A protein has these predicted regions:
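Bacterial N-terminal signal peptides that target proteins for export
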Residues: 1-8
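C-terminal motif of bacterial Sec signal peptides marking the signal peptidase cleavage site
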Residues: 15-18
Length: 131
């Protein structure tokens, strides 16, 4: 009886541990640029923040930056459309991140996107305060 309780408890713990690996894909949409900046300054904040976090700039156009992040065998690609008033971080594709048709992905992707978002906002603030 005691063995059965331990076995059931162990299975329960393993099931709970596995539940948190995938989460809904986090898109950051229309984040306001709270300062009066030019579009090129917002672009610079996005690129500088991305590079400092290990993202690689794949394309940098006048209204959008495409970024790629690789960690071991995992790869994520995002688009960052921007203007002088707003920016967004949008999922494009991934490899080995457990992405599924329901819009779920490994939680590390959301952590990477959140860190990038926070860094972009900090960099925008630094640029605005240096003017």
């Amino acid at each position: 009886m005691k063995f059965l309780k331990i076995f059931v408890s162990l299975i329960f713990v393993l099931v709970l541990a596995g539940c948190g690996r995938v989460q809904p894909i986090m898109d950051v949409e229309n984040t306001p640029v709270a300062y009066d900046l030019q579009k090129k300054q917002v672009k610079m904040a996005i690129i500088d923040s991305a590079v400092s976090r290990g993202w690689v700039v794949k394309k940098a156009e006048s209204n959008e930056v495409e970024l790629e992040f690789m960690a071991r065998t995992h790869k994520a690609t995002i688009r960052v459309p921007y203007s002088e008033k707003f920016f967004s971080i949008l999922y494009v594709s991934s490899e080995n991140l457990k992405a599924d048709a329901k819009g779920n992905i490994h939680r590390n992707y959301n952590r990477w996107v959140n860190n990038l978002n926070v860094d972009i906002q900090k960099k925008i603030s630094v640029i605005a305060n240096s003017n």
